[in-house]
């Protein structure tokens, strides 16, 4: 379990990148949901935390590949492989990421 930041410090519609062995991006959607995925686009090495968030979709800033934050699945080309998703919890106002195992997509 990795502490990220206080919930109040991550506004809706924003994201934050955390440095782990493989960087992780945490997103706070306009609907108030929290999602975490590997931060690197599976098409090319672009940071998804720098992409455009719309609903539960994140668009890669490099070639406009799009991923569903809930599943990690790509929703359009050029990406063909999913990004790994991670479980997110909030404890005492602090966002935590529970890293998924190397195999599979969800923690």
Regions found by a protein language model. Give the residues of each.
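Short cysteine clusters
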Residues: 41, 60-63
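N-terminal pre-ligand scaffold of iron-sulfur
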Residues: 1-55, 68-69, 82-107
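Short cysteine/histidine-rich metal-coordination sites, predominantly Zn2+-binding motifs
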Residues: 55-61, 74-83
């Amino acid at each position: 379990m990795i502490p990220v930041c206080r919930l109040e410090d991550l506004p809706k519609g924003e994201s934050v990148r955390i440095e782990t062995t493989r960087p992780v991006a945490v997103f706070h959607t306009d609907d108030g949901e929290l999602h975490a995925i590997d931060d690197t686009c599976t098409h090319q090495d672009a940071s998804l935390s720098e992409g455009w968030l719309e609903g539960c979709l994140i668009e890669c800033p490099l070639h406009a590949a799009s991923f569903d934050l809930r599943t990690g699945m790509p929703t359009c080309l050029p990406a063909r492989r999913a990004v790994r998703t991670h479980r997110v919890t909030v404890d005492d106002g602090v966002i935590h990421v529970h890293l998924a195992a190397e195999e599979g997509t969800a923690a």
